[in-house]
Design a protein with these regions (language model features):
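A shared catalytic/ligand-binding motif for oxyanion handling
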Residues: 1-149
């Protein structure tokens, strides 16, 4: 967890790395146990595609995945990449064992902070089976108004 500020506005970045087995339950537990504030961004490998578009095989999502999506929605969180790219099939992970691609690495943010997210993109990596995700945020500098001037 990283806590800091950008342009005098607090931000918390939380990294999650879910296990391969039990990922859905782990992520759901982590999300519900966190005190998700408006300026909290959750990043990491959750080992779960959240939509059929997040798999090269376009499989239906499981009931457990829908439960996780419901939890994300109840916590007023959004999948920032999918929000910015609702129709784009782009992946963060290649499974050489299965010969498939998926987007199992995610950045989640609070719905109320949507205006602070400028752009998001997946950056290819040649050194890892996972690609990086870059999120640009747009925090406006606060101006101080002085009525005595």
């Amino acid at each position: 967890m990283i806590k800091g500020s950008i342009q005098e506005e607090d931000i918390t970045i939380i990294n999650i790395h879910a296990p391969n087995i039990g990922a859905l339950q782990y992520v759901r537990y982590m999300l519900t146990s966190m005190k998700g504030e408006i300026n909290t961004v959750i990043v990491g490998d959750i080992n779960t595609p959240l939509t059929p578009m997040d798999r090269s095989t376009k499989q239906k999502i499981k009931k457990e995945t829908q439960t996780l999506n419901d939890t994300i929605d109840q916590l007023d969180l959004i999948d920032i990449y999918r929000t910015f790219h609702p129709q784009t099939m782009n992946f963060t992970f290649f499974s050489s064992a299965h010969g498939t691609f998926s987007r199992i690495d995610h950045i989640l943010g609070h719905k109320a902070s949507l205006g602070k997210f400028k752009k998001i993109k997946i950056i290819p990596s040649i050194f890892s089976e996972h690609n990086a995700i870059r999120l640009d945020v747009n925090y406006r500098r606060k101006t101080i108004k002085n009525s005595n001037i």
